[in-house]
UniProtKB/Swiss-Prot annotation:
A Pfam family matched in the record: IF3_C
PANTHER family: TRANSLATION INITIATION FACTOR IF-3, TRANSLATION INITIATION FACTOR IF-3, MITOCHONDRIAL
Keyword Glycoprotein: no
InterPro entries: T_IF-3_C_sf, T_IF-3_N_sf, Translation_initiation_fac3_CS, Translation_initiation_fac_3, Translation_initiation_fac_3_C, Translation_initiation_fac_3_N
GO cellular component, one term: cytosol
Subunit structure: Monomer.
Record protein name field: Translation initiation factor IF-3
């Protein structure tokens, strides 16, 4: 039931739903007609066979516009659909390794990263150094450099080997823009 109320709250007030005594009225051509009382504004909209719609509730006096409400709703839906179509969703895929990873295992993970970068997904490369490996920075750097060398033709490093905790290093790689 609350979702029904939420949908109603998002809808602007139209015609008889408007209970304000006075309001600023804008006609169907965009001209500001100034402040009017409710009855005169509703009569003016009815005489043009259009609707009176509250477009802004600023302060005590709302701003209303005379327009075709069905056309107005259609235009709003079309604009929302257009903006959703223009959005690009960026996915982030994650690869997690240990510093002492085998050569073949690293190549397999690099192939996965290449495939994801070709699909225009970002890749988060994580090195987890547990136990005494936390103190062996040379192994961490070596694993990082090997991986980056394997995928350098497919992506660019945005955030390089950042230490996010005592044992976790993260690198973010974006696909190369063509």
């Amino acid at each position: 039931m609350s979702s029904n109320n939420d949908a109603r709250k998002n809808q602007p007030l139209i015609n008889d739903q408007i209970r304000f005594r006075t309001m600023v009225v804008i006609d169907d051509h965009g001209n500001n007609l100034g402040e009017m009382n409710r009855i005169d504004a509703l009569n003016l909209a009815a005489s043009k066979n259009l609707d009176l719609v509250v477009i802004a509730k600023k302060g005590n006096i709302p701003v209303t516009k005379i327009l075709d409400y069905g056309k107005y709703k259609y235009e709003q839906k079309r604009r929302q659909k257009e903006s959703r179509k223009n959005q690009t969703i960026i996915k982030v895929k994650e690869i997690k390794i240990k510093p002492m990873i085998g050569e073949h295992d690293l190549k397999v993970r690099a192939e996965n990263a290449k495939r994801w970068l070709e699909d225009k997904d970002n890749v988060k490369f994580v090195i987890e150094a547990r136990g005494r490996m936390c103190t062996k920075d040379e192994f961490i750097v070596q694993a990082y450099e090997k991986f980056i060398d394997l995928i350098k033709d497919y992506g660019t490093v945005v955030q390089a080997n950042k230490k996010v905790s005592n044992y976790r290093y993260e690198t973010i790689i974006e696909p190369i823009k063509k």
